[in-house]
Amino acid sequence: MSSSQNFPYLPASSPRSADVVLYLDLNGVVHHEKVLWHPRKGIYMSPYEAAGHSLFEWVPILESLLEPYPAVALVLSSTWCIRPGYSATLKRLPASLRARFIGGTYHKHVHGVDPWNLSMFRTTPRGVQVQDDARRRKPRQWLALDDDLEGWPDSCRENLVACEGTTGLSNPVVQHELKEKLRGCHAGLSA
């Protein structure tokens, strides 16, 4: 769980960093993975593949799991960083979660805005995106909550809490794993 084995500890000296960071994907984590986008409708659940589901339906579970750990910061690691964008995404989340966000894995200042750079970012495996961001932020501890399991570097797999895209955080096994890893991060800071 700790990235301090690979990187020297540097205290969180700016609002863009924190001692403990949770990299949060959205699709397949806080709601069903079958999300669609339309230029006029925006983002919505597939009425065929995710009937009965709604956007952000499992957010209350995340809020509950994070409540004992007010110092845990969130970083958006999702395609939502690009569309609809970081700021627009945060507006859709409850205030309790918005206050925890310190950024996203996609940064216009880091990755640029030209189509080639955007394409390169989109084709980079999620685990590599998260690893690169963790190297920039240098948190003492970090975790990732994601249903995109392909291409994660072996050195980062212990930080990953893997979700199944149709059940995400509604799965009690995932909830238990996240709870235990958050507890471990907290204990690691106290040691």
List each language-model region with its residue ranges.
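Short amphipathic alpha-helices and their capping/turn segments at secondary-structure boundaries
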Residues: S2-L22, Q131-K138
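Aromatic-residue detector
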Residues: Q5-F7, Y23-L26, Q141-W142, E150-W152
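Proline-rich intrinsically disordered, low-complexity coils
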Residues: P8-P11, P15, P60, P68, ...
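Alpha-helical substrate-recognition element adjacent to the catalytic core
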Residues: Y9, P15-G112
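C-terminal cap/substrate-recognition subdomain and adjoining C-terminal extension
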Residues: S87-A191
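N-terminal amphipathic/basic-hydrophobic helices that include classical n-h-c signal peptides
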Residues: M1-S2, H32
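A short, highly charged, low-complexity intrinsically disordered segment
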Residues: S3-S13, E63, G184-A191
